[in-house]
Amino acid sequence: MSKIIDPPNRGKSNTAIHKVQDGAKYPKTSFRGVKTTYNYLPTNESLENWLPSFFLSGANALINKEKLIQLGGFDEIYSPYYYEDADLGIRAWSVGWKCYFEPKSICMHTPSSTISKLKSEKVKLIIERNRIIFNNIHLRGWQLHFFNCWLWLRCIIKLIKGNSTIYKAILLFRENKYRIKKSKEKLLQLCEKTKKYYSVYDTEKYILKKIKKIKYRIF
C-alpha cells in the first residue's frame, strides 16, 4: 500500500500543503481488543525499504490476485463499510502471507467523501457493530473473553449515560452469529491448507520486531 495524503490546502505562502492520512498500519492490541486506527511512518523519508503493515488500506492496495481469491476477497459480513480491509489483511497474516507499505508511493484521497453524507449515528452504529464482529472473528481464548467482558462494561457505562449505540451494536452482532461462525471456519480451513496459523498477537510481535531498529512516528 501507499502513503495516503489529503488533497492540497493552501498555506500562507500559497504553497500546496498535503496532510498525511495513512502510513503503514501499526499493530496495537490489548485486553480491549485490536486497534486498527494507528499508523506509522519512518522519520527518515529517504528510506526505500518496504515496511510491514498490519493491513492494507482499502483506499489503495496492490494485492496478489491468486492470494486474494484464496482469501475469498472482502468479507461481506462488514457491509456496507468499515473493517473489511483490516479483516482481509489480518486473514492474510494468519495464513503466513505478508502486507507491506511502500514509503515512496503516494496516493491522494478525499477521506469519507461518501460516508460523510450519511447520518452520523448510523455510521457510528455500523462501526461499533463491525468492530465487535472483527474482534470476535480474530481473537481467541482468554483474549476474546476479556474483550467481550470489556465490551459489556462499556455498554453498561454508556447506557447509564443515555447512549445506546453499543447495546444496539451488540444486538446486530448477535444477529450475525451464524455468519461469524462461517467466517471463522473459512479462515481455519485456509490455515489448515497453508499449514500455518498466526494470531493477531503473533503478527503484532513480528511487525514490532521487524521495525525495532527503525526510527518512526506513530499517528
Give the role of each language-model region.
Residues 99, 117-143, 164-180:
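Catalytic core of nucleotide-sugar-dependent glycosyltransferases
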Residues 62, 80-83, 89, 98-103, ...:
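Conserved active-site beta-strand element of glycosyltransferases/polysaccharide synthases
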Residues 1-73, 77-80, 95:
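Acidic/His-rich active-site region of diverse nucleotide-sugar glycosyltransferases
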Residues 44-47, 71-72, 108-118:
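Short glycine/proline- and charge-enriched loop/turn segments
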Residues 143-219:
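Non-catalytic, C-terminal membrane-associated alpha-helical segments of glycosyltransferases
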Residues 88-89, 131:
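Short, hydrophobic alpha-helical packing/hinge segments within bilobed ligand-binding/sensory domains
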Residues 1-4, 101, 148:
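Short beta-strand segments
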